[in-house]
């Protein structure tokens, strides 16, 4: 995992506790080609665990370079096998205009 993401692990834990058990909070690690979950709380919502691959929606955001146009996407519809439809939001963690952990040659 990119060392610049390490402080966000604490933020994931904080948000999970502050928002409560009905909110899953996930930190993605983009250093590998497929990307993985680096930290997750309240994973009873999706059943995902650390090391699991990114969701299809996260991959669409990355491949569509949504992060170049906006800092976050809020209130879109997600889905979970365990919980059905979800209200989801994504914040892009960047260094300048680049996603942290996403190398230039994989863009």
Which sequence ranges carry the predicted segments?
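Glycine-rich acetyl-CoA-binding "A-motif" of GNAT/NAT acetyltransferases
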Residues: 99-100
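Sensor-regulatory modules in signal-transduction proteins
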Residues: 93-96
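Conserved small/polar residues in nucleotide/adenosyl-binding loops
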Residues: 105-106
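Structured interaction and signal-relay segments at domain junctions
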Residues: 16-74, 79-81
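A short beta-strand signature within small-molecule sensing/ligand-binding domains used
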Residues: 84-91
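Short amphipathic alpha-helical segments
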Residues: 5-13
